[in-house]
Design a protein with these regions (language model features):
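ATP-binding Walker
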Residues: 14
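Conserved phosphate-donor/acceptor-positioning beta-strand/loop module used by diverse small-molecule
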Residues: 95-99, 110-132
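Walker A/P-loop
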Residues: 17
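Small-molecule kinase domains that catalyze NTP-dependent phosphoryl transfer to phosphate-bearing small molecules
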Residues: 132-182, 186-188
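P-loop (Walker A) phosphate-binding loop of NTP-binding proteins
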Residues: 11
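ATP-dependent small-molecule kinase phosphotransfer cores
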Residues: 38-95
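Hydrophobic anchor at the beta1->P-loop junction of P-loop NTPases
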Residues: 8
Length: 188
């Protein structure tokens, strides 16, 4: 049985990674939910995402040998999801894919039935969060926010939008409640 795929996208500052980490920490380890590990051509860091770090050459080899079910470029890096990350478990399963808005339509086309979860926030909230990180100047943040792509949602796509304006201890349970409304979502 194929897993249910949830392709998660959102702009920088929306809290996508924080919410995914919250879900990972709160859901039982024995649940049929898992997170596809990304393959990225950047070094792994202790405080960063647990991804498979590969060189540019290794990433090119994975593409040439068709070992990636999904792949895209963003922020000077190459991202991919190996086919093995999308394999079903013995029981019905759900797989979260931390994806890209720019690649969303291609992902939906190549994985029929995939659900898209768009985690976002109003512009002023995104700006405040990005400023709080202290990684970019206000000018760079404004440029980032101005180039946010418009989402063209494919026909027939199960699309969910989650506005994340609240603190994590409020937004995490709200997101989980929204996910439990999906048909076939595992009982707690």
């Amino acid at each position: 049985m194929s897993p249910h795929l949830i392709y998660v996208v959102g702009p920088s500052g929306a809290g996508k990674d924080s919410l995914l980490n919250w879900l990972r920490a709160k859901l039982p380890a024995a649940s049929p939910l898992r997170w596809a590990r990304r393959t990225i051509n950047r070094p792994a860091t202790a405080e960063g995402e647990d991804h498979e770090s590969v060189s540019n050459e290794a990433f090119s080899f994975l593409l040439e040998t068709q070992q990636l079910a999904m792949h895209w470029s963003a922020n000077t890096h190459q991202y991919g999801i190996r086919y093995s990350e999308l394999l079903p478990l013995p029981q019905p399963s759900w797989v979260f894919v931390n994806g890209s808005r720019a690649y969303m339509n291609e992902a939906v086309a190549s994985h029929p039935g995939m659900k898209v979860l768009h985690i976002t926030a109003e512009r002023h909230v995104l700006q405040q969060r990005l400023l709080g990180r202290g990684r970019e100047s206000l000018e760079n943040i404004e440029q980032r926010l101005n180039r946010t792509p418009h989402l063209n949602i494919p026909a027939g796509c199960h699309f969910m939008e989650f506005l994340n304006h609240d603190p994590l201890e409020v937004s995490g349970p709200k997101l989980l409640k929204a996910l439990t409304a999906l048909p076939g979502w595992p009982a707690a």
